[in-house]
């Protein structure tokens, strides 16, 4: 009986060590992939409190994002470092927001995204790598298990909105035209 207990303890210990090693390997591979990225172009589906929006974005590290929404307002979002502008082209109106406390900044800055990868709790499925990071705000980041591409994130923003953002990368490391991420002037 004692032999069986020792045998199962050894098997359990080997299983735990292999799991930790696999997790470290996944994180190392994602880190390598992120370090090679300077920019991505992607399409997205965004779900905020039950409302779905779709569009396409250009993301350039660090801190630059431009998204065009496929909606009737012809909404355009531009982030350049810590400034955010949302323009509704149909109505020719632009709204400006501070985002300095937004958990969304964790995605726009590669060093913060790498911190999530290194410190986040890893969960694996057949298709997705899920990293859960608890800091001031909870953020969950998703990566494709095969390609290690960023697939999306889930956050609760500073206004307590549940935001689920899924993306499909179209291109990597493109160079965008100068002025692409210019914040529109105040009207």
Each model region followed by its residue ranges:
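A short, Trp-centered hydrophobic/proline-enriched beta-strand micro-motif
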Residues: 32-52
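Short hydrophobic/aromatic-rich beta-strand segments that constitute the beta-sheet cores
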Residues: 42-44, 65-69, 84-87, 131, ...
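Cleaved targeting-peptide boundary
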Residues: 24-32
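Sec-dependent signal peptide recognition
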Residues: 6-14
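Gly/Pro-enriched, hydrophobic low-complexity segments
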Residues: 115-187
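Solvent-exposed strand-loop boundary residues in beta-sheet-rich modules
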Residues: 48-50, 90-92, 159
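An acidic-aromatic
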Residues: 57-106, 163
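Hydrophobic h-region of N-terminal signal peptides that target proteins for export
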Residues: 15-24
